[in-house]
Swiss-Prot record:
Gene3D superfamilies: 1.10.1510.30, 3.30.70.3160, TruD, catalytic domain. It is an enzyme of class 5 (isomerase). The lineage of its organism: Archaea, Methanobacteriati, Methanobacteriota, Thermococci, Thermococcales. It comes from the Archaea. This is Probable tRNA pseudouridine synthase D. Its EC number is 5.4.99.27. It comes from Thermococcus onnurineus (strain NA1).
Amino acid sequence: MDYREFFSQFKYLSEKPGIGGRIKAQPEDFIVMEEPLRSAFDGKKYAIFLLKKRNWDTMAAVKEIAKRAGISYKDIGFAGTKDRHAVTYQYISVPRDAKEKVEAVRIKDIELRFVSYGRALKLGHLLGNRFKIIVRDVDESAFERTKEIVRELRSKGGFPNYFGYQRFGERRVTNHLIGKLLLKGDFEGAARLFLGAHGGGMEGDEARKNFWETGDVNRALEEFPGFLRYERAMLYRYKETGSWRKAFLSLPLPIMRIFIHAYQSYLFNLYISRRIEEGLPLNEALVGDIVVQIKGGIPYRDRTYRVTETNIDFVKEKIRKDEAMVSGPLFGFSMRRARGVPGRLEEELLAEENLSLKDFKRLPKPMAEPGGRRELLIRPLGLTYGYVPSVGMCFRFFLPKGVYATSVLREIMKDH
């Protein structure tokens, strides 16, 4: 299953036909500029650089910079991962005494510019991202169709805040399935899927297919290419211990958490889709809903309150004034649960998946996931668009952190 087939299960909010087209035909068609928190520049222990990269994934770029500078990649901080097939600008931090080494680094398709001194950057330490995106292979009529779709979505409160396909895997859509197996304590099943899932014409697929069919660890170690370093490390660990649990837990923690987060994201997407399917509003609070506070267009997901018969008019006014948004579940052991009709939808999803919130606590401690809430709608700030002859549609907008530009474009393009 590729990501298009996978996403076909999630309902569109807009009913108007999409413009079609194609994104990321070339890296310059997808430009991302990170907006840092002001506090990133407080302090003097770290040197802050602006990293421009083209066709590089963030982690690969960081590791290459560290290698060339002669420092540990763990000493390089960054606030968020950015698309690979794009031109992206983001901030990184390095220890102050490594400043000159990093300034001397020269790598194809990577540029580094010292900006300021500040503090060590960590994941999540950003406001959001600005985007400039070109959709190609559309004609001039795409402008009017875009206008109609945007008008319809504004009347419905915004764009559905689906997690994008990047969360699940573009060619091997398995991250959420591995996450579910981990939650069920099936480390062998999770490891076999991680190692053996194949398809999409990727290098190493033949070796993965052979392992999927035979489960032969020794053969896999002979056949798996060297760049599949996490897979090979897992296979070696299994050979040493005979335990798939120990083998899986040998993966770096950030990699393991990707799978749990992907499963949370899948359930959140299902919740939005189910709400659309049942005709329940995404921009209007129902009794039992949990809403998140909004300030300056930025959601504060740790500031929530429940909608009751008593406060519902007050909440609706807050939503009307863009000071609050209805939220959906990021299931976890301490997530604040909805009640009423929204609560019923949450319970139905858990029942269908044979899942309990306690399952998220039974995970090995570093992976245990408390969960939280996430707003159901996206309201892109400063959204502008236009048709450029012989090029296509050009879109510009800002999104808060953790929100996917591809989910905005999905409603307009109707491409997956």
